[in-house]
C-alpha cells in the first residue's frame, strides 16, 4: 500500500488548484493527484470536449487569478472554447510542476477510513494497489457522476451514450448518424442539439414535462452590447438576487427589505426575462414554445430547471431553422434495432441516443454509513436530528428574504430534499463536515461540490480557505453554529432555485457574496476595486484577486510574529514544511 500525506481526487479546476495551493503553503508535502480520465481538465478533459462546446463565461472571467488564459478560439461574444480551456489546464499542470504528482487513468472504487493505528483514509483503486493518505481532498466536482437512465431493451442495436462521451463519438456521428435522439433538458442537451443541428442531423429531443420547466437560457449579450456574464459579475446585478450570504448594507435593506425596493427587484427580473424571451423568440414555433422558462413571467429568476447562457451567438437561428422535433414525454423502451418507444404512444427511428440527463453526486465511493457521517447523505436519524435546525433555517430565510416567500409551486415531492439522492451536502461553507471539524478532524475537504458558473475563482478561494484550515492555521465556529449555517444555506437555495436548490448547492447569480464570505473568513478584504463606482458597476474578474495568496501569507506571518515574538517566517504544521514567503 502506497502512503501519501495528501491525495487529491480529481484533476479539474478544483483539484488542480487545491493541489497547487497546498504545495505553495506546504511545499514538502508528499501529495498525489488521481483522476480516472486520460487527460487533465475534468469536464474539460480532451475526451469530453468537441468543436462547438464553449464555457458559459466570457474570457477574462474564466481563468485563475494569477495565470492568464490565452485568447485562442474565442467566440464572437467572448466565450471560451472547450479546446482552449483544456489546453489552459494542461499548461497550468505543467507550469506549476504538478505533472510528477499526477496519476491519470486511476479510478477510485472505494474510500474508507484508514487503520485505527494510522488514521487517515484508504482509497481502493481499480486495477491498482490501495492508497493510504493522512488527508483527503475530494475534488470530483458536481459533474463527474453521469445519470444514465435505463429502459427495457429488446434487440436495440444503436449506441446509447451520455453527453459526457459526446466528444468520443464525433467521428461516428459525422459518418453514421442521420437522426439522433437527445434525452433531457439540462444545459448539455442544448449544447448537444446545437452541435447535431450544425452537423445537419435530424434531432428528436425528448424531455419530460413538469411545472419546473426547461432550462432557462439567457441571450449571450445584453441587447447586443454587453456580455451577459459580465453583467452578472457586477455587485449591482448581484444585489438584485435575494441571497442569504448578503443580508446587510443599503442595497440589501432597500431591494430586499423595502416594499418599493422589492418592486424594483421584480421589475428588474421581469425585464431580464423579457429580454431572454425576445432573444429566443419562443413564440415562433410550437417546438420553441416548449423550451420557454417557467413561470413565464420570471422564469429566468427562479431557474428551477437550471440557468445558463446561449454561448453560440446563432443558437436560436440554428434551432429555428433546424430539423428538430421536441417530444414532451419520456422514453418507455428501446426495441427493434433502432426504435425509441415513447410513453405518449409514439415511436421514433434513431441512429444514436444521447443522454443529457445531468449528473448525480459522485459519492458512491463512500459506504452508506460513511456518507451519512460526512453529511453527504441523510438517513432517518440525521433527518430527525436536523429537523429543528431546518425549521429554524426556513424561518430565518423567510424573515431576511421576504421576496422568496412567494415561490411558485413545484411538481417535485415536497420531501425530496430529505432523500439521499436529492439533498444538498450539509457542509459548513460547502467544504467542511461540521461534526468532524468540531472534533478536530481536519483530514477531509470537499471543494467543487457546488453549482457556480464562475468556476476558476471559486476553486481558488475554496482551495485557500480549505488548505489553510487543513494545515491548522484557522479555527472554525462551534459545531452548532456550523450546522446552522449549513441548514440555513440549504433552506435558502431550496427557496431561491427551487428544484435545482433541492438537489444541489446552487447559486448561479450569487457567486460574489460567496466569494466575499470566504474572503472575510480568511481575513482578506473582499472589496477589490479602486472606487465606489467600479465596485458596483464594473465586472469582477479573477485578476482582481491575483494577490490573495500573498495577502494571506502576510496575515499569517503577522499573526505568528504577534504570538511568538520571534519574527520567524516559517513553521512546521501538521507534519509539513510550511512556506510563509
Curated annotation (Swiss-Prot):
Induction: Expression is positively regulated by the depudecin biosynthesis cluster-specific transcription activator DEP6.
Record has Oxidoreductase as a keyword: yes
InterPro entries cross-referenced by the UniProt entry: FAD/NAD-bd_sf, FMO-like
Chain sites annotated for binding FAD: 43-46, 108, 470
Cofactor: FAD
Keyword Zinc set for record: no
E.C. designation(s): 1.-.-.-
Entries under Gene3D superfamilies matching the protein: FAD/NAD(P)-binding domain
Gene disruption phenotype: Impairs the production of depudecin and accumulates an epoxide-containing metabolite of slightly higher retention factor than native depudecin.
Pathway where this protein functions: Polyketide biosynthesis
A Pfam family of this chain: Pyr_redox_3
Binding site for NADP(+): 54-56, 183-202, 219-220, 351-352
Known function: FAD-dependent monooxygenase; part of the gene cluster that mediates the biosynthesis of depudecin, a highly oxidized eleven-carbon linear polyketide that acts as a histone deacetylase (HDAC) inhibitor and makes a small contribution to pathogenesis. The reducing polyketide synthase DEP5 is the central enzyme in depudecin biosynthesis by yielding the backbone polyketide chain. The monooxygenases DEP2 and DEP4, as well as the uncharacterized protein DEP1, then act as tailoring enzymes to modify the intermediate polyketide chain into depudecin.
Family stated for the protein in its record: Belongs to the FAD-binding monooxygenase family.
PANTHER family xrefs: DIMETHYLANILINE MONOOXYGENASE
Protein name: FAD-dependent monooxygenase DEP4
Gene designation per UniProt: DEP4
Amino acid at each position: 500500500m502506497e502512503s501519501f500525506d495528501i491525495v487529491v481526487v480529481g484533476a479539474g479546476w478544483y483539484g488542480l488548484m487545491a493541489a497547487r495551493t497546498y504545495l505553495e503553503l506546504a511545499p514538502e508535502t508528499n501529495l498525489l493527484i488521481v483522476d480516472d480520465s486520460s487527460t487533465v481538465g475534468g469536464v474539460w478533459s480532451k475526451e469530453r470536449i468537441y468543436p462547438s462546446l464553449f464555457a458559459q463565461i466570457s474570457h477574462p472571467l474564466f481563468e485563475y487569478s494569477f495565470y492568464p488564459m490565452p485568447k485562442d478560439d474565442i467566440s464572437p461574444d467572448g466565450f471560451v472554447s472547450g479546446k482552449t480551456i483544456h489546453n489552459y489546464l494542461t499548461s497550468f499542470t505543467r507550469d506549476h510542476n504538478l505533472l510528477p504528482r499526477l496519476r491519470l487513468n486511476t479510478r477510485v472504487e472505494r474510500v474508507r477510513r484508514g487503520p485505527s493505528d494510522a488514521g487517515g483514509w484508504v482509497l481502493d483503486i481499480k486495477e491498482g494497489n490501495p492508497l493510504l493518505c493522512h488527508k483527503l481532498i475530494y475534488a470530483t466536482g458536481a459533474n463527474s457522476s453521469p445519470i444514465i437512465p435505463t429502459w427495457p431493451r429488446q434487440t436495440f442495436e444503436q449506441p446509447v451514450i451520455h453527453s459526457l462521451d459526446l466528444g468520443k463519438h464525433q467521428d461516428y456521428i459525422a459518418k453514421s448518424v442521420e437522426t439522433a435522439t437527445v434525452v433531457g433538458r439540462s444545459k448539455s442537451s442544448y449544447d448537444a442539439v446545437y452541435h447535431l443541428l450544425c452537423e445537419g442531423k435530424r434531432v428528436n429531443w425528448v424531455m419530460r414535462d413538469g411545472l419546473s420547466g426547461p432550462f432557462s437560457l439567457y441571450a449571450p449579450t445584453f441587447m447586443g452590447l454587453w456580455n451577459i456574464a459580465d453583467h452578472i459579475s457586477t455587485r449591482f446585478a448581484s444585489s438584485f438576487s435575494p441571497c442569504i450570504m448578503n443580508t446587510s448594507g443599503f442595497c440589501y435593506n432597500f431591494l430586499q427589505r423595502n416594499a418599493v425596493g422589492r418592486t424594483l427587484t421584480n421589475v428588474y427580473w421581469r425585464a431580464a426575462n423579457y429580454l431572454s424571451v425576445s432573444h429566443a423568440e419562443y413564440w415562433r414555433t410550437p417546438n420553441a414554445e416548449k423550451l420557454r422558462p417557467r413561470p413565464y413571467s420570471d422564469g429566468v429568476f427562479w431557474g428551477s430547471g437550471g440557468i445558463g447562457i446561449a454561448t453560440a451567438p446563432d443558437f436560436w437561428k440554428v434551432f429555428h431553422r433546424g430539423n428538430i422535433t421536441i417530444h414532451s414525454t419520456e422514453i418507455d423502451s428501446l426495441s427493434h434495432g433502432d426504435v425509441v418507444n415513447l410513453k405518449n404512444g409514439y415511436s421514433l427511428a434513431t441512429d444514436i441516443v444521447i443522454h443529457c440527463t445531468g449528473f448525480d453526486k459522485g459519492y458512491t465511493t463512500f459506504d452508506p454509513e460513511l456518507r451519512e457521517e460526512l453529511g453527504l447523505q441523510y438517513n432517518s436519524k440525521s433527518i430527525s436530528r436536523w429537523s429543528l435546525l431546518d425549521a429554524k433555517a426556513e424561518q430565518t430565510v423567510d424573515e431576511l428574504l421576504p421576496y422568496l416567500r412567494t415561490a411558485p409551486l413545484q411538481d417535485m415531492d415536497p420531501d425530496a430534499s430529505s432523500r439521499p439522492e436529492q439533498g444538498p451536502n450539509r457542509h459548513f461553507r460547502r467544504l467542511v463536515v461540521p461534526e468532524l471539524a468540531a472534533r478536530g478532524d481536519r483530514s477531509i475537504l470537499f471543494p467543487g461540490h457546488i453549482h457556480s458558473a464562475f468556476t476558476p475563482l471559486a476553486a481558488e478561494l475554496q482551495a485557500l480557505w480549505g488548505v489553510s484550515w487543513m494545515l491548522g492555521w484557522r479555527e472554525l465556529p462551534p459545531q452548532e453554529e456550523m450546522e446552522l449555517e449549513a441548514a440555513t444555506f440549504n433552506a435558502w437555495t431550496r427557496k431561491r432555485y427551487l428544484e435545482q436548490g433541492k438537489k444541489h448547492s446552487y447559486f448561479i447569480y450569487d457567486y460574489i457574496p460567496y466569494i466575499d464570505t470566504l474572503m472575510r473568513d480568511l481575513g482578506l478584504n473582499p472589496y477589490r476595486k479602486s472606487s465606489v463606482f467600479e465596485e458596483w458597476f464594473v465586472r469582477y474578474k479573477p485578476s482582481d484577486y491575483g494577490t490573495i495568496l500573498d495577502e494571506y501569507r502576510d496575515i499569517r506571518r503577522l499573526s505568528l510574529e504577534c504570538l511568538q515574538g520571534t519574527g520567524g517566517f516559517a513553521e512546521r504544521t501538521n507534519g509539513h514544511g510550511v512556506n510563509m514567503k
